């Protein structure tokens, strides 16, 4: 069947001539430099930062020569997440996570910038002069070599201004990225097909009075092309109420409703036409005089004169540059009903900005044509309005999606808006970039905020990437995960130690595999003995610390010389009682009992010696081999209220970790202390804690303290000095419980107002269709964001701390011979039904 419609080939009307040296050259000899723009992540920018970004745009636009066009093009396209199974991992939970997010829809954002040098004649032309309906003549001016060189210098200066701002990054697009290759479609081809990815064939473009089509997609266009359509005032940003509270602000750019908050396929085009400002103002002066002379015939002329005078006064008094601007939102869909919904959504979003929604069908073809990368000079002049650079820049999109970290190492979290999985590195890349100086982390979250759930998620992923994990827990939070690892590794990892009367935890602090006792090992033994001897509020004197250190040194020397002596607390106690005390008595310079009371020391330590009530604790016959166990949990809930045992058990576990830390070279080590950190906060333990936190970074390790009580951290100066000040990564969960006293937390943790606003926005506007809780992660006081901890049902059942759910899974696992994975699968299937 023959096509009876009026038709022509794309080639005959195509406005572009060539792409050379990273520049697009049109058939009218306009030259365009193209960039990809990297904007700040959404919900992470403050009002002050938005003002800084706005000022940067204004400064950059001012360096462009006369008769230049800035065309900023933001693409928002619906895509589906596809996991990279090679990177996802082979573990049961890792693969279930990948399956959970497979085909998750999200709105992907790409931002491009096109800077075009054209001529005065081209900038004045209207839609009837579009290349859609005329031939091409190369103007003489653009053939001038000096004009081109000056423009390219201005482009370089423009890019340097934006890149130096610290908020925006520009990357020049190559020839292949513009035109495409055999395997990849270029940006020009993607625009003509309205497809963000590779396209195998070109689409027909149909233009009529009623609608415009690209392939099977019908376009819907809303324009801001007249000052009457604009709000009375524009700003750099606005308060986003859904994530704000009466104590905090969440800010978005003024044009954000036309960006990520508009959930459909669309392109937001932003144009600024830089002409000769002085010439424009002179033309306005002439127009004002004409209006003034005609004002006696029409009140409207008098009003127009007044408006023009106000515009001129503003320009001259503030030194502003007059430009023209245009903004349009172009959406598309192949479904007619969906397009109606999109049209309503676009109108609502424009209205929320204070704009008049103008659905433009007449100019859709010429505006689509002008939107071709490199063809901004073909824009119809009648579709633009006069304004100043400062006002035009307020309508630029200022934020983008959360980005994946380029690091190979990291954890998987989720985007706040769509739930798209994100790969973020909170350990290695921030260290390399100098954002943090250590990998230590401080985690604060009230009961029920998802703290243990998040920590399970974090340590599981660290473990699967080769980390040696040691956990000190007081609530069985990691039991399910530990048992799964134990089963999967056939007992090599997933070691779970718990304290019971029948089988108490026992250690031997004087044992080393190679018989080597370095300074750190000796200091840890001395600290342990001081903890056993002194009460929590009774600090040791210098003499007591020195004498105890000397006794430890002398005992170690003796066991190294005499292999018949079995290293243990029993033999140390005997050495202290029978040998060291006698040596003290024979010294020329006597030590007074008031300075070092060795009898008091022996009396206090006797309960840990043979026959004492705690003689099992420090005299283990077989050393616990933590060295090559990659996932070890110490569950010490049974002794957490025992004032004598709790500090001892905790410090010995810490000492065991330090041994692991020193001996495993080039291997990531991670120590997680839940509420057990309280045992380390006494005066005698302060130096030990400071040592651990300051030293662990040198051994490719990180210490993580997890707590839920604000009062604990506020009342403990040790925590502030040792833990918080040496933790460059801070992780906070839902703090609404403490909203009225958050100023204390803010002061203690040294949080900025920006970080405070982010933290108080946690869980304020969660999607009810998804099961997740949000968490704030701050790095070095300069980089921070809120992420969603969303997991699969299988992961949820492995991490859950709900008693009924744990009992259901564990009960079924026992029936299946201890197979936690099989039990989780069955319970998950039941819940789906």
Question: Which stretches of residues belong to each language-model region?
Answer:
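Short glycine/proline-enriched loop/turn "hinge" motifs that connect secondary-structure elements
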Residues: 23-29, 102-107, 317-322, 414-416, ...
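Short, cationic low-complexity segments
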Residues: 133-161, 356, 445-450, 798-824
């Amino acid at each position: 069947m023959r096509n009876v419609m009026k038709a022509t080939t794309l080639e005959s009307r195509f406005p572009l001539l060539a792409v050379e040296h990273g520049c697009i050259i049109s058939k009218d000899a306009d030259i365009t430099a193209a960039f990809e723009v990297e904007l700040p992540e959404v919900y992470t920018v403050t009002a002050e930062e938005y003002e800084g970004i706005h000022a940067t745009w204004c400064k950059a636009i001012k360096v462009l020569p006369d008769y230049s066009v800035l065309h900023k093009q933001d693409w928002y396209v619906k895509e589906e997440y596809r996991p990279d199974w090679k990177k996802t991992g082979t573990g049961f939970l890792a693969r279930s996570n990948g399956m959970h997010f497979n085909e998750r829809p999200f709105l992907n954002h790409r931002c491009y910038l096109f800077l075009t040098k054209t001529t005065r004649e081209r900038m004045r032309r209207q839609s009837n002069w579009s290349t859609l309906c005329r031939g091409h003549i190369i103007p003489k001016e653009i053939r001038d070599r000096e004009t081109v060189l000056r423009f390219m210098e201005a482009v370089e200066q423009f890019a340097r201004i934006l890149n130096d701002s610290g908020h925006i990054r520009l990357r020049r697009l190559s020839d292949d990225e513009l035109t495409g290759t055999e395997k990849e479609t270029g940006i020009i081809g993607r625009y003509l097909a309205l497809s963000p990815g590779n396209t195998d064939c070109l689409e027909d473009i149909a233009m009529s009075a009623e609608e415009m089509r690209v392939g099977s997609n019908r376009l819907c266009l809303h324009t801001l092309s007249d000052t009457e359509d604009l709000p009375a005032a524009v700003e750099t940003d606005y308060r986003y109420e859904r994530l704000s509270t009466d104590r905090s602000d969440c800010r978005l750019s003024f044009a954000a409703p036309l960006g990520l908050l508009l959930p459909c396929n669309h392109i937001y085009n932003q144009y600024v036409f830089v002409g000769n400002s002085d010439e424009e103002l002179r033309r306005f002066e002439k127009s004002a005089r004409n209006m003034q002379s005609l004002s006696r015939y029409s009140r409207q002329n008098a009003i127009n004169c007044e408006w023009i005078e106000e515009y001129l006064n503003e320009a001259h008094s503030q030194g502003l540059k007059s430009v023209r601007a245009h903004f349009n939102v172009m959406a598309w869909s192949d479904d007619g009903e969906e397009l109606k919904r999109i049209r309503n959504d676009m109108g609502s979003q424009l209205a929320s900005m204070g704009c008049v929604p103008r659905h433009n069908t007449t100019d859709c073809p010429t505006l689509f044509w002008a939107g071709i990368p490199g063809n901004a000079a073909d824009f119809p002049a009648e579709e633009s309005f006069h304004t100043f650079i400062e006002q035009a820049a307020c309508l630029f999109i200022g934020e983008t999606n959360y980005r994946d970290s380029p690091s190979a190492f990291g954890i998987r979290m989720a985007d706040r808006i769509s739930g798209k999985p994100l790969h973020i590195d909170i350990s290695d890349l921030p260290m390399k970039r100098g954002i943090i100086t250590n990998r230590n982390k401080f985690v604060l979250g009230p009961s029920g905020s998802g703290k243990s759930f998040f920590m399970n998620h974090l340590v599981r992923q660290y473990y699967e990437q080769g980390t040696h994990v040691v956990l000190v827990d007081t609530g069985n939070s990691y039991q399910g995960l530990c048992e799964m690892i134990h089963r999967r590794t056939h007992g090599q990892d997933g070691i779970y130690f718990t304290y019971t009367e029948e089988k108490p935890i026992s250690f031997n602090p004087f044992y080393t595999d190679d018989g080597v006792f370095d300074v750190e090992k000796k200091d840890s033994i001395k600290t342990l003995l001081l903890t056993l001897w002194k009460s929590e509020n009774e600090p040791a004197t210098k003499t007591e610390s020195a004498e105890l250190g000397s006794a430890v040194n002398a005992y170690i020397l003796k066991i190294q010389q005499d292999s018949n002596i079995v290293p243990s607390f029993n033999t140390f106690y005997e050495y202290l009682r029978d040998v060291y005390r006698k040596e003290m008595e024979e010294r020329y310079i006597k030590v007074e009992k008031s300075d070092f009371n060795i009898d008091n020391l022996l009396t206090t330590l006797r309960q840990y010696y043979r026959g004492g009530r705690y003689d099992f604790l420090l005299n283990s016959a077989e050393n616990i081999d933590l060295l090559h166990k990659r996932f070890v949990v110490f569950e010490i809930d049974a002794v957490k209220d025992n004032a004598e045992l709790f500090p001892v058990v905790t410090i010995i576990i810490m000492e065991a970790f330090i041994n692991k830390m020193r001996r495993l070279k080039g291997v990531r080590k991670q120590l997680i202390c839940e509420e057990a950190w309280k045992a380390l906060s006494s005066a005698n333990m302060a130096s030990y804690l400071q040592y651990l936190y300051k030293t662990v970074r040198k051994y490719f390790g990180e210490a993580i303290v997890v707590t839920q009580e604000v009062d604990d951290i506020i009342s403990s100066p040790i925590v502030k000095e040792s833990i918080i000040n040496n933790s460059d990564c801070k992780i906070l969960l839902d703090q609404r419980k403490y909203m009225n006293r958050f100023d204390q937390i803010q002061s203690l943790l040294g949080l900025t107002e920006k970080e405070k606003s982010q933290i108080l926005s946690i869980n304020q506007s969660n999607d009810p269709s998804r099961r997740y809780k949000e968490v704030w992660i701050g790095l070095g006081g300069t980089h921070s964001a809120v992420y969603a901890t969303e997991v699969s049902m299988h992961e949820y059942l492995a991490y859950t701390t709900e008693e009924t759910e744990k009992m259901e899974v564990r009960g079924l696992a026992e029936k299946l011979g201890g197979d936690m994975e099989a039990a989780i699968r069955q319970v998950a299937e039941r819940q789906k039904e």
